[in-house]
């Protein structure tokens, strides 16, 4: 099954170069096309002597765009059966090719989005599976350090969607900027009767949160949360049945 992968670089040239080599070495059988969007000017990517085993398209923005707008533009007009949103700071584990399992999971009836388990650099499981954010849920997670029991959304570091599901929700809502696009996308998939399904796959993702380090990112995060909480999608999603934590086995 063919898949198009969208990667957005904000000056992450070295990380993108590494990721492309990992995709070429391990996942070429699953991937037919990769679109790399340079959101800011940066040096050209180096092409290996034998070329890439997939079609590589480079988009250079004249002005920076938001997370959702970049991926929507990259995946507009996709004809591949599956689309993948992939962060440049994701690493593939040695001898653990994730995309075959992600595509198989995304192919299951009723699945709107497949995702892998995310680990940090030392192998600890990252909290990519989250409850619908609310002031109370944020208090429990950030202040009380409680683990979330439900999976209402997953972060967009590595998502694989069947093309019909992506088209049905029309991609990301571009009115969000840098934060909550993934929350909104997952809620709209679930409102459409589709489920989020963890695949039996692992990737490494640092999971750095810029909103905890930079005031500008914190402001963007708060604005996006307020937009989410005032949205019709959020209001309707609050009535959805709880989605249990868990997914594909990792043997």
Residue ranges and their predicted role:
Residues 12-27:
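Short, well-formed alpha-helical segments that are part of the catalytic scaffolds
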Residues 31-41, 57-61:
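Short beta-strand/loop segment that forms part of the nucleotide-sugar
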Residues 61-78:
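Glycine-rich, basic loop-to-helix element that forms the pyrophosphate-binding segment
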Residues 83, 89:
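Short aromatic/hydrophobic "clamp" motif used to bind/position activated sugar donors
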Residues 94-126:
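Conserved donor NDP-sugar-binding/catalytic core segment of glycosyltransferases
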Residues 132-152, 156:
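Short, flexible, basic/aromatic active-site loop/helix in glycosyltransferases
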Residues 153-170, 174-202:
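A short, conserved alpha-helix in the catalytic core of glycosyltransferases
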Residues 184-251:
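Active-site-adjacent helix/loop segment of glycosyltransferases
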């Amino acid at each position: 099954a063919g898949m198009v992968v969208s990667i957005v670089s904000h000056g992450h040239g070295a990380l993108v170069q590494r990721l492309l080599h990992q995709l070429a070495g391990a996942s070429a059988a699953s991937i037919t096309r990769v679109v790399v969007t340079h959101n800011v000017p940066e040096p050209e990517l180096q092409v290996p002597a034998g070329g890439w085993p997939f079609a590589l398209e480079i988009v250079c923005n004249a002005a920076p765009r938001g997370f959702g707008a970049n991926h929507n533009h990259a995946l507009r007009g996709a004809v591949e059966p599956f689309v993948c949103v992939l962060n440049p700071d994701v690493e593939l584990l040695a001898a653990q090719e994730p995309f075959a399992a992600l595509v198989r999971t995304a192919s299951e009836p009723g699945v709107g989005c497949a995702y892998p388990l995310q680990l940090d650099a030392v192998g600890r499981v990252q909290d990519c599976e989250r409850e619908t954010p609310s002031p109370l849920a944020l208090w429990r997670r950030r202040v009380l350090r409680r683990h979330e029991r439900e999976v209402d959304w997953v972060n967009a570091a590595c998502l694989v969607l069947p093309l019909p599901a992506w088209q049905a929700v029309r991609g990301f809502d571009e009115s969000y900027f840098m934060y909550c696009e993934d929350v909104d996308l997952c809620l709209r998939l679930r409102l459409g009767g589709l489920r989020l399904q963890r695949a039996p796959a692992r990737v490494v993702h640092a999971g750095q949160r810029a909103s905890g380090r930079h005031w500008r990112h914190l402001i963007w995060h708060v604005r996006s949360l307020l937009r989410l909480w005032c949205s019709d999608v959020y209001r309707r999603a609050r009535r959805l049945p709880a989605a249990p934590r868990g997914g594909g086995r990792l043997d």
